[in-house]
């Protein structure tokens, strides 16, 4: 089949996940046209796919953040300012998809390709983790009503891939489905993570792309612990703190050998750490409902803890409980990406056998 694959560019986790699914689709004989938004996602996808699939940049909806919080007003302003240029670029890509003869659309939280599927009456499959907010039952953790920013997050989530024929939701927590046309699978991980083995050492990995100065201030007050820090924007050694340049292979090796991980509560970092059996201190972005949801489940399952901010007492308290978190992680349901691939294959197979 000729499959258009949409990838949202907010963060790199969506692109990393999409690479795995797209490579699987190519291996199954499908042709793929990738439409990716954001600054880094198109380049990452093109590099990882190596010409096996056509990758086209698009202009997606842009989310603006202020002091770690989602700014709805600024997001609207930014999107309106880019509307004319965005339309020209996007129209070129959609015309290319028409001329190519697209037969189905898969979207990883990307709204333009979802709109394209609906406007062309093409089958649409959504594959992402974000739909867990609205399609899974979270009563085990007290529901989602109290999550910061949840009202806006629900609206954005529903608007990304509305009316998809099916939703494949990747999740690390055992929440049952609450809506039809929903399949839950474990997280889709990079092959390098799946191949890595746990070998805990003494260091703690800290990864933070925002509010890095506050994190470093806290780490300096815990001199008894060696830290390997990613996301600082510089490299070097500052006493017990090593500032690391980002390298995929080294990062995975540092995580698999870490005593623990401190970082944001994004889905990719958290699920890679949990798969490797590494306890996590998660610091969700203020007003980012999905990260707060991840943190609540992390805490509920005993795999780590959450914190609104990081200071020395919080770090020491977390490390004092890290053995208990590691013990809980021994029961974490690990596995490869095959369940997710099977779900995608099943859906595409049904579309091929019954195109109506």
Task: Please annotate each region the language model reported.
Residues 123-184:
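Active-site-proximal region of nucleotide-activated glycan assembly enzymes
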Residues 9, 27, 32-84:
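Conserved nucleotide-sugar phosphate-binding/catalytic loop shared by glycosyltransferases and other
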């Amino acid at each position: 089949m000729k499959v258009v694959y949409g990838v949202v560019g907010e963060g790199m986790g969506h692109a990393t996940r999409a690479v795995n699914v797209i490579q699987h689709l190519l291996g199954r004989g499908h042709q793929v046209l990738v439409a990716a938004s954001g600054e880094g996602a198109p380049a990452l996808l093109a590099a990882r796919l190596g010409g096996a699939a056509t990758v086209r940049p698009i202009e997606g909806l842009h989310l603006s953040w202020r002091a770690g919080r989602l700014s709805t007003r600024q997001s609207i302003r930014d999107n309106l300012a880019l509307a004319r240029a965005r339309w020209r670029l996007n129209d070129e890509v959609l015309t290319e998809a028409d001329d190519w003869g697209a037969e189905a659309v898969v979207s990883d939280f990307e709204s333009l390709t979802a709109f394209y599927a609906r406007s062309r009456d093409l089958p649409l499959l959504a594959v992402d983790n974000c739909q867990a907010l609205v399609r899974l039952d979270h009563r085990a953790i007290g529901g989602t009503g109290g999550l910061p920013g949840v009202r806006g997050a629900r609206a954005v989530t529903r608007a990304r891939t509305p009316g998809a024929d099916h939703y494949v939701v990747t999740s690390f927590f055992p929440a049952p489905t609450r809506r039809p046309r929903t399949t839950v699978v474990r997280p889709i991980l990079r092959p390098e993570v799946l191949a890595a083995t746990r070998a805990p050492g003494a260091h703690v990995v800290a990864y933070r792309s925002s509010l890095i100065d506050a994190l470093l201030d806290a780490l300096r007050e815990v001199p008894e612990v060696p830290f390997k820090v990613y996301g600082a924007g510089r490299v070097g050694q500052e006493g017990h703190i090593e500032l690391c340049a980002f390298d995929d292979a080294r990062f995975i090796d540092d995580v698999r050998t870490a005593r623990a991980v401190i970082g944001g509560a994004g889905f990719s970092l958290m699920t890679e750490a949990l798969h490797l059996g590494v306890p996590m201190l998660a610091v969700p972005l203020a007003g980012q409902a999905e990260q707060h949801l991840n943190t609540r489940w992390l805490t509920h399952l005993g795999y780590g803890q959450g914190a609104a901010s990081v200071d020395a007492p919080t770090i020491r308290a977390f490390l004092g409980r890290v053995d208990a978190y590691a013990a809980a992680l021994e029961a974490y349901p690990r596995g490869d990406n095959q369940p997710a691939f099977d779900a995608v294959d099943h859906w595409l197979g049904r579309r091929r056998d019954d195109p109506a």
